[in-house]
Amino acid sequence: MSILDLFRWIQDTAPMTALRESALVYPIVMTGHLTGMALFGGMICITDMRLLGWAMRDTPVNDVIDQLRVWKQIGFVMVVGCGAMLLGSKAELYYYNPFYWTKMALLLLVGVHALAFRKVYANPAAFPSKAKVAACLSLFIWIGLVTAGRSIAYWDVPAELTPIYGSEGMTTHHTRK
């Protein structure tokens, strides 16, 4: 089974079809995804700005990280949960969307970044210059990720898929014919 076959199979399940065709549930899930991204991304941005010394200078870095941890976790669960539902509902369109794959590559890079700088984030005071590098890289990766994610909705369906989905592509609720 290819990735495309898997995406089509997921998309054609009853829950994903119902989600895709719902004029109420789909926007709620999208709102949950964007809210989770704002929460998760916002907490990361605050952490990075503190590591760079641009915000909350009077608060120790470890305190900022500890205080934001639960909010990051809530945002992460929202982003992943709602994102999986959004992917499943229009999986074939996402498969062909270059911005989706760019977003996935940047998500992978986020994971690599987190692993590479794990010791730095655990004790940023011990590695001040590395913490600043980690924060700069994090901000750039997340800006790219959010840009790619928002671009997904504005990608035009290629002509060869138009008979299947119509020219509206990602912006409409429909069933694959």
For each of these PLM feature ranges, what is it?
Residues 1-177:
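Polytopic transmembrane helical bundles with strong interfacial aromatic enrichment
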